[in-house]
Amino acid sequence: MAGWAGFELSALNPLRTLWLALAAAFLFALLLQLAPARLLPSCALFQDLLRYGKTKQSGSRRPAVCRAFDVPKRYFSHFYVISVVWNGSLLWLLSQSLFLGAPFPNWLSALLRTLGATQFQALEMESKASRMPAAELALSAFLVLVFLWVHSLRRLFECFYVSVFSNAAIHVVQYCFGLVYYVLVGLTVLSQVPMDDKNVYVLGKNLLIQARWFHILGMVMFFWSSAHQYKCHVILSNLRRNKKGVVIHCQHRIPFGDWFEYVSSANYLAELMIYISMAVTFGLHNLTWWLVVTYVFSSQALSAFFNHKFYRSTFVSYPKHRKAFLPFLF
């Protein structure tokens, strides 16, 4: 009974509950969109909170009260500025702790304890044999935090030097959520590091010898997925540029090439694969991170559904074999 009680307590920590709630909310919203039209909520605000960019423009004329809360879609770059700074800081603190034995600041330890207290275990209760998985988990969290920072840095670069933003908008609620999102993701990664009070279990000198097959596979998958996402964003950008790379319009065109041959939102599919690569890096059995992946799947699938609907209603010649998000399936 004590074992089950401990499992239930760890399974219901605030962090997992939050990601589960977000995943369930977006999955429910997706199922509503797939339901018959008569079952869809008629509230304009509900639809406005779900859509952004071109899918927001493609609907019927939006009420003035909705337009009053518009934020330019180009403000996406703000999300990645915050992520680079915040998650870069978390990566620095984790590196200091792993390689120099420096404790986390009091405020960070308190925050992590609040979000996921199950990571704090008494060292005296751990046998020498059981510290090996803890060391592997520490390496996993370190690598995933590196991946998250690299991903954010690349996306920030793309916002400034690759993407061509139109005058499309996002809702201010979506904007505020985006500002908080990468802060929460970084804390989620850090909360998986095995710790005793403020000190990380494993020092860096023993960290690299903990590398396992899933660390290597996760790294390969991450860079493979990132390369495809970058290529997809270049394809989308080139639709608005001439052969010299000069922006000539901000209209929408049908993308071709790479994963766009299979799905309408290839960049969203790549985003999902990036998060799955992080789940692999965690050893495929980290429940908290799989809840994050479930949220990413639900939110990206919803956006992909709207994109697919936009393309099919806008372009008569749109390829009929393409799916919205998952090749050959959805």
Curated annotation (Swiss-Prot):
Catalysis: reaction(s): a di-trans,poly-cis-dolichal + NADP(+) = a di-trans,poly-cis-polyprenal + NADPH + H(+); a 3-oxo-5alpha-steroid + NADP(+) = a 3-oxo-Delta(4)-steroid + NADPH + H(+); androst-4-ene-3,17-dione + NADPH + H(+) = 5alpha-androstan-3,17-dione + NADP(+); 17beta-hydroxy-5alpha-androstan-3-one + NADP(+) = testosterone + NADPH + H(+)
Gene Ontology BP annotations: dolichol biosynthetic process; dolichol metabolic process; dolichol-linked oligosaccharide biosynthetic process; polyprenol catabolic process
Disruption phenotype: Death by 12.5 dpc. At 10.5 dpc, embryos are smaller and fail to undergo axial rotation observed at 8.5 dpc in wild-types and present dilated hearts and open neural tubes.
Cell cycle recorded as keyword: no
Pathway membership: Protein modification; protein glycosylation
Pfam family, one: Steroid_dh
EC number: 1.3.1.94, 1.3.1.22
Lipid bilayer topology: Multi-pass membrane protein
Subcellular location field: Endoplasmic reticulum membrane
Highest taxon of source: Eukaryota
InterPro entries: 3-oxo-5_a-steroid_4-DH_C, Dfg10/SRD5A3
Gene Ontology CC: one annotated term: endoplasmic reticulum
GO MF: 3-oxo-5-alpha-steroid 4-dehydrogenase (NADP+) activity; oxidoreductase activity, acting on the CH-CH group of donors, NAD or NADP as acceptor; polyprenal reductase activity
Primary location: endoplasmic reticulum
Role summary: Plays a key role in early steps of protein N-linked glycosylation by being involved in the conversion of polyprenol into dolichol. Acts as a polyprenal reductase that mediates the reduction of polyprenal into dolichal in a NADP-dependent mechanism. Dolichols are required for the synthesis of dolichol-linked monosaccharides and the oligosaccharide precursor used for N-glycosylation. Also able to convert testosterone (T) into 5-alpha-dihydrotestosterone (DHT).
Family membership: Belongs to the steroid 5-alpha reductase family. Polyprenal reductase subfamily.
Protein name: Polyprenal reductase
Originating organism: Mus musculus (Mouse)
Gene: Srd5a3
